[in-house]
A protein has these predicted regions:
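Solvent-exposed soluble domains appended to multi-pass membrane proteins
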Residues: 311-337, 343-346, 350-696
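Generic detector of well-ordered alpha-helical segments enriched in charged/polar residues
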Residues: 128-135, 189-192, 207, 284-287, ...
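Transmembrane and membrane-interface helices of multi-pass
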Residues: 1-277
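Short alpha-helical interface patches
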Residues: 176, 185-193, 205-207, 284-294, ...
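Alpha-helix initiation and N-capping motif
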Residues: 185-188, 279-286, 303, 364-365, ...
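Membrane-interface segments at or immediately adjacent to transmembrane helices
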Residues: 251-343
Length: 696
């Protein structure tokens, strides 16, 4: 019926008005054909079962499209009435008013099309975020309006584009429980390759959005196109293109120089992409991450120079650190033994005794001091404190420091890591099974997608810990260690296992620490609210130490070679207040770095060739921990990892705030007077080559 009405209206229009304006008639009929083809496509997809059982939704969608197809030819007649029925000035004012109304309608509808299919918290979105979405959409639609010569098709293209964005986010949410981030756009080919493995099904809300899009198309079919002819037409085309170019340049400058996070305080770290996207809206969240995507290119950078630096540092490593008999012996031993490697990143594990012993009531975390036979131990300096866990694991896996990527970035949510060399991928190439455990939501920090990109074969999240023992903020450390041990006992293949614990997570106001871990400390000048958090946190660390004792005892008794690397991801948030109260008047950089310090150790349950295993101490950045692990156990190393360890001789610790030179002094990256400035710039260049150039 809809098709018949459309054909009849087009034929009637052509017979009556062909001689008066062929291009306008063709334009109207093209709109009718386009909408009718969309209706036909919906019918075919529904018949094929692709659209699921939503009969009512399909019916409304087809009705909306058919209505648009039948009404499109009427646009010409109404436009003629408007042109002939009003004075020229009044007519232009009416056209401008109509254009503005329809443009706003298109912008608002597109906002709904982007958000409604997947955002069940749309009603709670702050007005500022909704307005930001509308402003950004308005700018985009204005540019499309000019680019398409003020015709219907530019606005239709924009509406179709944002409807596609909403659909894509709906399916990504349905399949992966994740938000689309800029790095996903960089890996569209990969996404398309795996899309065939999912079953597509549309919800009632989605059909409502599609119907709204169809009604928008109906409204847009009345949108006036360019009606000038001859020289006037050429002048109008030129003016529109010029305005588009000026606008595009202006938007580009705006995007580069005005950070949305600074204007409306959008979240740049995005630890919970789905939650943040729902609260802020898709468009402000995506734009914020995109603005934070770029890694500064080092001065005088070239691939040839970077490769030369990497090779030179790798050669220096082989001449010095890699030339010993112990090193060659460890390499031969690794090739023969293929030890399993377990990496534990313990949530918020740190030693608050570096600030104070609280009048002698607390001696500090037991590790690494409780492990005299460690291969290596000391402190690492994460780039985050109080939160931002994913950047710590990123630095460990990639050997790249956030110090050279830029502050206020969350690597997992803005970069495609599938082309980056990482520890999981390295061990996978060596024939290892690669497994990750995290007793929480796998979508946090985009981990589910990122772990797959980095080479993990399996990722076990909270759903795999049903019935597990809990402590404080989640599944206990011991429960995760039990899963690791089960894997080591049941699978004889060499394993690379990453265990990200959860129990110590803040906040520390739950008042749920049982005996014998409950603690009560005191400190003159410190408020009770902070002291109560300290009490709860210390109780968590005491329990973590006991669980770690238990785990290491089991590993010692295990009849297979295992290497354990353990580190804390960051300090708890309240240590900033301890630091400010107890250490006033320090230089700012050294003061800041005190809250960027957590314990680590590397240990094995077997004797490693060339290692005294007497608890040697060495502080380092998390970017050096992975390469140092490989070096100690004799595993094959990449040249970039050798380069990191070579430069570590001068740059003892590197994180987002700066670096500690081999003289024990902290320096900022822009301190050109530093005796280690040249080494820092070399590491910046090397890191851009092996990381930055691969993700942008």
């Amino acid at each position: 019926m809809g098709l018949l009405l459309s054909v009849c209206s087009c034929v009637l229009l052509a017979r009556r008005k062909w001689s008066e304006g062929k291009s306008e008639v063709i334009h109207a009929c093209a709109w009718s054909a386009f909408l009718e083809l969309l209706a036909l496509l919906v019918c075919v997809l529904h018949a094929a079962g692709v659209l699921g059982p939503q009969i009512r939704g399909v019916s409304w969608l087809i009705l909306a499209l058919s209505l648009g197809a039948a009404c499109a030819p009427v646009r010409y007649l109404l436009q003629r009435k408007l042109d002939n029925g009003a004075p020229r000035v009044a007519m232009r004012l009416l056209v401008i008013a109509r254009d503005l109304v329809l443009m706003f309608f298109a912008v608002f509808t597109s906002f709904v099309l982007v958000e409604l299919p997947w955002n069940d918290a749309l009603g709670a979105m702050p007005v500022t975020m909704a307005c930001a979405s509308l402003v950004i959409l308005g700018i985009i639609f204005a540019l499309l309006y000019l680019l398409f010569q003020r015709s219907t098709f530019g606005i239709a293209f924009g509406a179709l584009l944002f409807m596609g964005v909403g659909l894509a986010q709906f399916f990504v949410m349905s399949f992966k429980g994740a938000a689309i981030v800029p790095s996903d756009v960089l890996s569209l080919r990969t996404a398309a390759a795996v899309a065939g493995g999912y079953e597509f099904s549309l919800s009632q809300e989605l059909f409502g959005c599609l119907s709204a899009a169809a009604l928008l198309a109906v409204a847009l079919s009345f949108f006036p196109g360019l009606v000038e002819h001859g020289r006037a037409r050429l002048a109008s085309v030129g003016a529109n293109i010029a305005l588009f170019c000026v606008g595009a340049v202006g938007v580009s400058c705006l995007f580069s120089n005005v950070k949305l996070s600074e204007v409306i305080d959008t979240d740049t770290m995005c630890w919970d992409p789905v939650g943040i996207y729902k609260y802020q809206g898709f468009i402000p969240s995506f734009v914020t991450l995109a603005q934070n995507l770029e890694i500064p290119i080092p001065e005088d950078y070239s691939e040839a120079r970077a490769d030369e630096l990497i090779q030179g540092c790798a050669d220096e490593f082989e001449r010095s650190q890699g030339a010993s008999r112990g090193s060659s012996g460890a390499s031969a031993q690794f090739a023969q033994e293929k030890p399993s490697v377990v990496a534990v990143m313990n949530e918020s594990y740190s030693d608050t005794s570096i600030f104070t012993t609280f009048n002698g009531a607390y001696d500090g975390a037991r590790y690494p001091d409780a492990l005299p036979d460690a291969l290596l131990c000391g402190s690492v300096v994460p780039s985050v404190t109080g939160g931002g866990t994913a950047n710590s694991e990123f630095e460990f896996f990639s050997s790249a420091s956030m110090g050279y990527n830029g502050a206020a970035k969350m690597a997992y949510t803005i970069y495609d890591l599938s082309r980056v060399n990482t520890l999981p991928a390295q061990f996978k190439e060596l024939g290892y099974d690669t497994v990750a455990y995290h007793p929480h939501n796998g979508a946090n920090y985009n981990r589910t997608a990122v772990y797959d990109a980095m080479g993990f074969d399996e990722f076990h999240t909270i759903g795999d810990f049903a019935g597990a023992e809990s402590f404080h903020a989640g599944v206990s450390d011991k429960a995760t260690y039990e899963r690791v041990l089960e894997r080591l006992e049941e699978d004889d293949d060499p394993q690379f296992i990453f265990d990200l614990t959860m129990a110590n997570h803040g906040g520390y106001v739950l008042d749920n620490i049982p005996e014998p871990y409950s603690t009560e400390v005191s400190l003159d000048g410190m408020g009770d609210d902070i002291l109560s958090q300290v009490d709860e946190y210390i109780g968590c660390i005491k329990r973590s130490d006991d669980d770690l004792d238990w785990f290491i005892d089991r590993l010692r008794a295990l009849d297979r070679p295992v290497v354990l690397v353990f580190f804390g991801d960051h300090q708890p948030g309240f240590t900033g207040e301890l630091n400010d109260m107890l250490f006033p008047g320090e230089d700012q950089l050294s003061h800041t770095q005190r809250v960027h310090r957590t314990p680590y150790f590397i240990w094995s349950n077997y004797d490693i060739e060339g290692s005294a295993q007497e608890g040697e101490r060495l502080d380092m950045g998390l970017n050096a921990l992975g390469p140092k692990l490989l070096q100690l156990i004799g595993a094959p190393m990449l040249d970039q990892q050798k380069a990191v360890l070579t430069l570590q001789q001068q740059l003892a610790c590197v994180n987002v705030n700066g670096y500690m030179g081999s003289d024990g002094v902290w320096y900022s990256f822009d301190d050109v007077e530093s005796p280690f400035y040249a080494a820092s710039e070399e590491l910046r260049t090397i890191q851009y080559r092996f990381f930055g150039s691969r993700v942008q």
